[in-house]
């Protein structure tokens, strides 16, 4: 799979979970304050796994839909707090966030833009944190990370901090080339974003649920995002599902604006599909019971040690 089948193919427990849920409640929407047991159970599980600041979950069917939703929620949030000009979102060159109109614009790969008239307005792209490819001669990883953080600050100041809403990135870039950033890169980026009231969005569609040896890539890099986007391995891709986690602060701003308007005019027929959520719950149980995240950390360390033996070849 595409960084997505964590428990392997033909896992009977996931198949049986889908069958049980189809027999019990095969479909149910989540509009008008409706919910169901799989939604409650999975949301509680995700909140327990995630960093402490996250308290609310919104479900979509894919990472592309999730990142589209994040763009809308960020705009909705800022409109609600009287900052309608705070719309611009900074992504990164070589980053990948999906292929719908907004998420495809966030993606920083030219073939996802060409002849699709992308990116749309208010989407910007900062430099890619690929030290081996883009560092100056003799520039250390620490110096490289500082330079990129400085460039990000310059971009925000050039655009106007009151117009920049968020910065989005994958903790480790996937489709752009499996690019591992310098160790302090994310801390420096976060410091700049906090300085200018810019939300930090961690796209963990690939890195979530153990790919970096911890539940989420943001934990690996000591990153404290405001929004967490999850998909792929949440169900080991046996069912289409993505989840957006936000903090109480963001939720309250969105809820207050929804109350003024009368509703939050966003959602999908199959948002929080009960079968997908039931499969996700069983999938996370399998990952935990078989200690797959711990195994990724152990095997990853051993792989690195062995690869270093070839450094002079």
Q: What does each of the following model-derived ranges do?
A:
Residues 1-313:
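Conserved N-terminal phosphate-binding loop of PLP-dependent enzymes in the Aspartate aminotransferase
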């Amino acid at each position: 799979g595409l960084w997505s089948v964590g428990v392997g193919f033909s896992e009977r427990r996931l198949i049986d979970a889908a069958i049980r849920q189809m027999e019990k409640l095969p479909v149910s929407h989540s509009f008008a304050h409706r919910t169901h047991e799989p939604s409650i159970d999975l949301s509680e599980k995700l909140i327990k796994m995630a960093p402490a600041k996250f308290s609310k979950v919104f479900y979509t069917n894919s990472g592309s839909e999730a990142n589209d939703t994040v763009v809308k929620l960020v705009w909705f949030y800022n409109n609600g707090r009287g900052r309608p000009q705070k719309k611009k979102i900074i992504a990164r060159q070589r980053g990948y966030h999906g292929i719908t109109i907004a998420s495809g614009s966030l993606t920083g790969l030219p073939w996802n833009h060409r002849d699709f008239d992308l990116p749309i307005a208010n989407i910007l792209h900062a430099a890619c944190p690929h030290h081996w490819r883009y560092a100056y001669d003799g520039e250390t990883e620490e110096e490289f990370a500082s330079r990129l953080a400085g460039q990000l600050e310059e971009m925000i100041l050039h655009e106007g901090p009151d117009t920049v809403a968020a910065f989005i990135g994958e903790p480790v870039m996937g489709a752009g080339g499996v690019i591992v950033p310098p160790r302090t890169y994310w801390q420096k980026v976060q410091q700049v974003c906090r300085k200018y009231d810019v939300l930090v969005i961690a796209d963990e569609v690939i890195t979530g649920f153990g790919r970096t040896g911890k539940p989420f890539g943001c934990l690996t890099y000591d990153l404290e995002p405001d929004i967490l986007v999850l998909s792929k391995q949440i169900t080991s891709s046996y069912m289409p599902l993505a989840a957006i986690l936000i903090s109480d602060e963001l939720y309250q701003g969105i809820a207050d604006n929804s109350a003024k308007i009368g509703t939050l005019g966003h959602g999908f027929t199959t948002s929080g599909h009960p079968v997908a959520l039931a499969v996700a719950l069983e999938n996370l149980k399998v990952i935990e019971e078989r200690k797959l995240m711990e195994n990724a950390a152990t095997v990853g360390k051993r792989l690195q040690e062995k690869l270093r033996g070839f450094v002079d070849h």
